[in-house]
């Protein structure tokens, strides 16, 4: 799997973006060809698919966590399906305690605390496991662009700062697909931020299905200390912004590629940086789980989703999707 950082030209067009544009057009054609030839399967339960239009963190994991807690509160049986990014997974697997991020992906390990999770790289491989578990609902994390299964309800997650970047498809830009196509088809659009941002003009036509959501800390962090922050996630800027909005003093930071698998050398270098800055290391839950027993001196910031339009969420999911009937 290719590890990528989010290049600056993905947000603001420059000569590199234009030079890569022809490859983006090929990417678009291949996507069209795949969609045209696909024969989607009907999964044996209602499907809620949570995805995004672009590469990089848009808060999908927090949305899935929120939905899992919502379904559990309603006593609805569900299974979460995750894509096992950054893992060496060979076939679809139900995640159990003891599985590592390298085996099933960092997101899978985190989501397993909220319900039964299947990690897979091929959506069709989940069928035997779903038939065995017999859930009422399947929450699928990512796979939004996957045409090989039917979706009953789709949620598109949009980062409030990056939005759709420079508007170009991979690799000229961050887009996986035409955002208008995804937004038109979406049942709900989550605008995710670390502050209470206003709905941008580009989402105004979809205001009736936009839910503003904030990523907020869910655990207490000592605000009297100084911290050196690091992360290997899709949107490190939002992580750093969350730390500052929480009132922490961040003396420095280091960014690793998304879904990065840390080496012992990385850990040693991080401790050296912390010592140099006379600070404590702090990172995300996705990163923290990769250090196993070696992370005792690293502070972990846990986050959750806070939304301001529960009525819209209830109307769309409970009534329109009728998933609880």
Curated annotation (Swiss-Prot):
It comes from the Bacteria. ATP binds at residues 54-61. One of its GO terms (cellular component) is plasma membrane. Keywords: ATP-binding, Kinase, Lipid A biosynthesis, Lipid biosynthesis, Lipid metabolism, Nucleotide-binding, Transferase. Transfers the gamma-phosphate of ATP to the 4'-position of a tetraacyldisaccharide 1-phosphate intermediate (termed DS-1-P) to form tetraacyldisaccharide 1,4'-bis-phosphate (lipid IVA). SUPFAM superfamilies: P-loop containing nucleoside triphosphate hydrolases. It catalyses: a lipid A disaccharide + ATP = a lipid IVA + ADP + H(+). It holds the Pfam family LpxK. Pathway: Glycolipid biosynthesis; lipid IV(A) biosynthesis; lipid IV(A) from (3R)-3-hydroxytetradecanoyl-[acyl-carrier-protein] and UDP-N-acetyl-alpha-D-glucosamine: step 6/6. Its EC number is 2.7.1.130. Belongs to the LpxK family. It is an enzyme of class 2 (transferase). GO terms for molecular function: ATP binding; tetraacyldisaccharide 4'-kinase activity. GO terms for biological process: lipid A biosynthetic process; lipopolysaccharide core region biosynthetic process. The keyword Cytoplasm does not apply. This is Tetraacyldisaccharide 4'-kinase. The keyword Nucleotide-binding applies.
């Amino acid at each position: 799997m290719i590890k990528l950082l989010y290049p600056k030209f993905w947000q603001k067009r420059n000569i590199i973006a234009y030079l890569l544009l022809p490859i983006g057009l090929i990417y678009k054609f291949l996507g069209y060809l795949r969609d045209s030839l696909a024969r989607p399967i009907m999964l044996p339960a209602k499907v809620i698919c949570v995805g995004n239009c672009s590469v990089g963190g848009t808060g999908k994991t927090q949305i899935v966590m929120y939905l899992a807690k919502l379904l559990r509160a309603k006593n609805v049986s569900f299974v979460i399906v995750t894509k096992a990014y950054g893992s060496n997974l060979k076939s679809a697997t139900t995640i159990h305690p003891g599985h590592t991020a390298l085996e099933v992906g960092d997101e899978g390990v985190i989501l397993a605390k909220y319900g039964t999770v299947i990690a897979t790289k091929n959506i069709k491989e989940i069928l035997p496991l779903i038939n065995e578990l017999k859930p009422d609902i399947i929450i699928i994390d990512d796979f939004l662009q996957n045409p090989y299964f039917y979706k009953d309800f789709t949620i598109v997650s949009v980062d409030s700062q990056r939005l759709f970047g420079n508007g170009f498809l991979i690799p000229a830009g961050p887009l996986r697909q035409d955002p208008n196509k995804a937004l038109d088809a979406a049942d709900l659009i989550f605008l995710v931020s670390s502050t209470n941002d206003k709905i941008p003009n580009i989402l105004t036509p979809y205001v009736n299905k936009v839910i503003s959501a904030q990523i907020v800390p869910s655990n207490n962090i000592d605000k009297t200390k100084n911290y050196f922050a690091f992360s290997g996630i899709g949107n490190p800027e939002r992580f750093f912004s969350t730390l500052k909005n929480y009132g922490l003093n961040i003396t420095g930071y280091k960014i690793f590629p998304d879904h990065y698998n840390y080496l012992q050398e990385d850990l040693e270098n991080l401790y050296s940086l912390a010592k140099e800055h006379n600070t404590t290391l702090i990172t995300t839950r996705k990163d923290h789980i990769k250090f196993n027993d070696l992370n005792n001196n690293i502070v972990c910031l846990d986050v959750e989703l806070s939304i301001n339009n529960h009525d819209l969420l209830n109307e769309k999911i409970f009534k329109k999707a009728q998933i609880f009937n």
